[in-house]
């Protein structure tokens, strides 16, 4: 059974104050979101990891990945206005990916997790 994890990180961190959304706040030299990504990669390196980020955060995330030399394979889907919309967008992205992949059939397991919760 193929496994996927949608990591939803669309928040703006307004309640935290400051200019940096909480998913990008450094924790021991890496953004919180990177710790979450690494946690799921350690759990199952064959699981497909999909980050759901607002479009305007995606260039910043890609820059961070280059800066810290991210080795965890993942894809990015566009976030939505609310968590509900972000999860929906991630599931639609995944459905298209599975539908377009040749030879894939059978059951899949999809987990949805908040990007700012790295301690799973």
Give, region by region, the residue ranges found by the protein language model.
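N-terminal glycine-rich phosphate-binding loop and ensuing alpha1 helix
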Residues: 2-58
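Acidic helix N-cap motif at the loop->helix transition within catalytic regions
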Residues: 59-64
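Hydrophobic C-terminal alpha-helix "anchor/cap" residues
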Residues: 40-41, 65, 94
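A structural signal for short coil/turn segments at secondary-structure junctions
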Residues: 43-44, 69, 98
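Conserved donor nucleotide-binding strand/loop of the catalytic core
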Residues: 69-81
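Conserved beta-loop-beta/alpha segment of the NTase-like Rossmann-fold superfamily
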Residues: 82-120
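Structural motif
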Residues: 27, 52, 77-78, 113
């Amino acid at each position: 059974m193929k496994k996927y994890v949608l990591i939803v990180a669309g928040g703006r961190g307004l309640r935290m104050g400051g200019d940096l959304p909480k998913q990008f706040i450094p924790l021991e030299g890496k953004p919180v979101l990177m710790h979450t990504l690494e946690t799921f990669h350690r759990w199952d390196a064959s699981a497909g990891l999909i980050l759901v980020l607002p479009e305007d955060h995606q260039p910043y995330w890609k820059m961070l990945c280059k800066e810290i030399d991210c080795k965890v394979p993942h894809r990015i889907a566009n976030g939505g206005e609310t968590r509900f919309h972000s999860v929906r967008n991630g599931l639609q992205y995944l459905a298209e990916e599975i539908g377009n992949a040749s030879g894939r059939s059978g059951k899949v397991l999809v987990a949805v997790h908040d990007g700012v919760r790295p301690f799973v």
